[in-house]
């Protein structure tokens, strides 16, 4: 379990999640925005590693 967004401010995390998720998984921007806890990245984002 990685806390990727822990190193980023909450607002910056939201922005990054929205942009990156939109580019990588177009139909799921809300999922990334909703999972600010980082669980989404831990399971679905290789770049978090």
Swiss-Prot record:
Keywords from the named record: Antibiotic, Antimicrobial, Cytoplasm, Isopeptide bond, Secreted
Q: What is the effect of changing residue 35 to A?
A: Decrease in cleavage by the isopeptidase AtxE2
User: Any chance you could tell me the propeptide residue ranges?
Assistant: 1-25
UniProt modification remark: This lasso peptide is hydrolyzed to a linear form by the isopeptidase AtxE2, in vitro. The isopeptidase AtxE2 only recognizes the threaded form (but not the unthreaded form).
Return one Gene Ontology term, BP aspect: defense response to bacterium
Residue(s) of cross-link: Isoaspartyl glycine isopeptide (Gly-Asp)? 26-34
List the subcellular locations: Cytoplasm; Secreted
Principal localisation: cytoplasm
Gene Ontology CC annotations of this record:
cytoplasm; extracellular region
Q: How does activity depend on temperature?
A: Highly thermostable.
Outline what the protein does: Shows weak antimicrobial activity against its phylogenetic relative Caulobacter crescentus. Does not show activity against other bacteria tested (E.coli, Vibrio sp, Burkhoderia thailandensis, and Salmonella newport).
Domain writeup = Is composed of a ring composed by 9 residues, a 5 residue-loop (SVSGQ) and a C-terminal tail. The peptide is threaded when the C-terminal tail is inserted throught the isopeptide-bonded ring. The loop region serves as a recognition element for the isopeptidase AtxE2.
**Can you say what this protein is called?**
Astexin-3
């Amino acid at each position: 379990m990685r806390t990727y967004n822990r190193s980023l401010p909450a607002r910056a995390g939201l922005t990054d999640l929205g942009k990156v998720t939109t580019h990588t998984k177009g139909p799921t921007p809300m999922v990334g925005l909703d999972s600010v806890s980082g669980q989404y990245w831990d399971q679905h984002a290789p770049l978090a590693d």
